[in-house]
């Protein structure tokens, strides 16, 4: 990937519950591009794993303006295979806690990779 394409990645996207996404939008991360594509995806009780995976794939492979994907850890667990298979530097995928589900560092794929590298 050229350095020019890295410069085009300026957005943070979020996949999560209503409270997490609302907080990120209030922080100013929300964006809708000229095609009507949003950089956020709200998970409800009716959201399927396939819909979460589709949003993740959109943000990590199709969109070239996303630099960071924040995903609630409970959602990452639902698409763990895709999270584990994402090895590109950009966009970076970071698992974050939600209001109802505490963060478990043992489930975080990035921390597991770091521990493997440093030999823990």
UniProtKB/Swiss-Prot annotation:
UniProt KW keywords: Hydrogen ion transport, Ion transport, Membrane, Transport, Vacuole
Localisation per UniProt entry: Vacuole membrane
Coiled coil start-end: none
SUPFAM superfamilies named in the record: AtpF-like
Membrane topology according to the record: Peripheral membrane protein
GO biological process: proton transmembrane transport
Gene Ontology CC terms: cytosol; fungal-type vacuole membrane; membrane; nucleus; vacuolar proton-transporting V-type ATPase, V1 domain
InterPro entries: ATPase_V1-cplx_f_g_su, ATPase_V1-cplx_fsu_euk, ATPase_V1_fsu_sf
Gene Ontology MF: a single term: ATP hydrolysis activity
Protein's job: Subunit of the V1 complex of vacuolar(H+)-ATPase (V-ATPase), a multisubunit enzyme composed of a peripheral complex (V1) that hydrolyzes ATP and a membrane integral complex (V0) that translocates protons. V-ATPase is responsible for acidifying and maintaining the pH of intracellular compartments.
Family in the record: Belongs to the V-ATPase F subunit family.
Complex formation: V-ATPase is a heteromultimeric enzyme composed of a peripheral catalytic V1 complex (components A to H) attached to an integral membrane V0 proton pore complex (components: a, c, c', c'', d, e, f and VOA1).
Protein name: V-type proton ATPase subunit F
This protein's encoding gene: vma7
């Amino acid at each position: 990937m050229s350095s020019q394409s890295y410069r085009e990645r300026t957005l943070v996207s979020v996949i999560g519950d209503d409270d997490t996404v609302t907080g990120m939008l209030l922080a100013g991360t929300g964006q809708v591009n000229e095609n009507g594509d949003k950089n956020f995806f709200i998970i409800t009780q009716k959201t399927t794993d396939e819909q979460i995976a589709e949003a993740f794939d959109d943000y990590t492979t199709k969109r070239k303006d996303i630099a960071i994907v924040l995903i609630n850890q409970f959602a990452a667990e639902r698409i763990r295979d895709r999270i584990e298979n994402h090895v590109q530097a950009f966009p970076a995928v970071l698992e974050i806690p939600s209001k109802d589900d505490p963060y478990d560092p043992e489930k975080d794929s990035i921390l597991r990779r770091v521990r493997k590298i440093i030999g823990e």
